[in-house]
Structure formats: C-alpha cells, structure tokens
Amino acid sequence: MISWNRIKHFTRDEFQDPLHGPESGDLINGEFLFMIVRLRIDTGWQIAIHWKVGGAVDVDGSHGHAKKSYHLKDQGCKAIDFHFLTDAPINQQFWEIAHAGFTGIGFYPQQNVPGWHIDNRPREESFIWKFVNGKYDYFLS
C-alpha cells in the first residue's frame, strides 16, 4: 500500500480512475510512482496527469485503452498520460523521460497541449511512438 503522506509532488487523486473514485489511485504501481516522482524532482517541472480522461489508472478498460495497456488494473497500473508545465523544448522533454528509464514512451503532438504517455513495461517490450493524424508510428527502442 502506498503511503501518500510520504509522496512528494503528487496525490492519490491524480492517479485515480474518474469512474471509480479517489481510492482507485491506490492501484498505481509503487515502483512506477517512484519513477514519476524522480522525474519530477530531477527536472523541476510540474507534471499534469490527464486523470480526468482516464490517463492514469483504468480499473476496467472503460477509457478506450488497448487490451494490454499498462493503464489497466489487469496489467499493473504502470502508465500515465500527461504534459509537463514547462517551456522546455520537446526534444529536451523526451530526453528527460528516456533518461529516467521509462520503457514505453508515446508522444501526442496534436493534443491541445502536446503530451506524453509513459509506462514501465518489460524491457523486451520497449517501444517509442508518436500519434499524428490518427495514426501511430512505432519505433523500437
């Protein structure tokens, strides 16, 4: 169980499935949460998680994620969609994410605020991708 009073920069609510209440934020994977906190501390950039649209924990697949998405409870809840609150160039943002050790990295440049997907999938399944004009372009890492 995560001791949220000991977590800096984030609250349980920021990871919740909006259809299942704040307590669903407890499902976020602890190791993954540690990596997100480290990313926030190392960069100094605030991280705005897109939890209100299912961009963190997805308890039952109600938010349109792929069947094996790492957002899903069945896959360990080790993914978020977010954007940084920074003016840093996208290339620098990518470098910081990759340097932090995330093994699934997606870039969504056409959102209202260009944003990211990060997850902690097994290394042998590592992927980097971008989503442009309704199409995913995948790159092996």
Q: What kind of feature is each model-predicted range?
A:
Residues H20, V53-G54, D60-H63, A100-I105, ...:
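Feature targets compositionally biased, intrinsically disordered low-complexity regions
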Residues E31-K67:
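Extended, low-complexity, intrinsically disordered C-terminal regulatory tails
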Residues K68-I80, F84-S141:
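Catalytic cores and adjacent binding grooves of peptidoglycan-active enzymes
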Residues T11, P22, N29-G30, G55, ...:
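Alpha-helix initiation/capping motif
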